[in-house]
Amino acid sequence: MASGNLPWELEEEILCRLPLGSLVRLRSVCKHWNDFFNDKWFIKKSLGCARPQFIILPESKIYSIGTIGLDGVDPKIEVRELACQFHFEAEKWAFTAACDGLLFRDFWNQGVTIWNPWLRQVGWIEYKENRDFRFCGVGYDAGKPEKGYKIFGYFNRFYDTKLKIDHRFAIFECASQAVKFIDSPEWPMLAGRGEYVSLNGNLYWTAYNEETREHFLGSFNFSTEISMRFCLLPCAKHVSGLRDKLVLTVFKGDRFALLKQSRISKDTKVLTAQYGPKARTKKNENAEKACLKSYGSLKPDRLEKLKKSMKRY
């Protein structure tokens, strides 16, 4: 039977929809397929089609947790151990961050590893003379054609006379390993205490205003090096001081999802954004509380049943 060649465009469309693990194994088929891994458009589209997975880091091993057959009658959870080429002690690292499919891991007072889980490539950034630098998150200047990753963090400043600790925020450029300090009077209010999430090169985090008792999303733009409040969060003002527990993540590749749990009632809700940062217009910039809307909720009794089922698994 005669065989024919598919158009390159059709091959790209098929390959970008394959699972990343299978796609890596196809690099050796031909030079053109291997070149896809250096094509920014192909990488972006492939990551956009990929099903999100969890990465867990127990002690010295790394695992990925994915779902198989969610659309069928017999969905399964797949747990895979991922090979890593670096060794660490669990107590020596503090933070992790993801950006463009890369995993950044901070080793306290030592440096940061940049790890591509699927290509099994590991890079190391050493802090050298800046060992007191505290890692927060990763981003890049979205206005430039080439992505130069930058680490957002801070240095502790100690005041001996009053025994107070202050933070001085800075940007650590991965390529040049240069540190640039950022001074702003808004930092005490805008600095978040939770995890920082990277989206379109910018950083976002949940923060809290002690004076107004309002939760909101803070943001940092690596292009302008300006921090600002992105939107208010629909959280109750608790006079008791017990704040809602918040977990922020990226949803559908271009917007946010927020898991919110009340520390009083233990009710858990999932909120999703109708639009992403790029889609914000002058019309909806003022409608801050409409930024995130409820997607679903989970009562404490159902959450307890879910925990028990997870323990059995």
Swiss-Prot record:
Transmembrane segments: none annotated. It holds the Pfam family F-box. It comes from the Eukaryota. Residues 1-46 form the F-box domain. This is Probable F-box protein At3g44130.
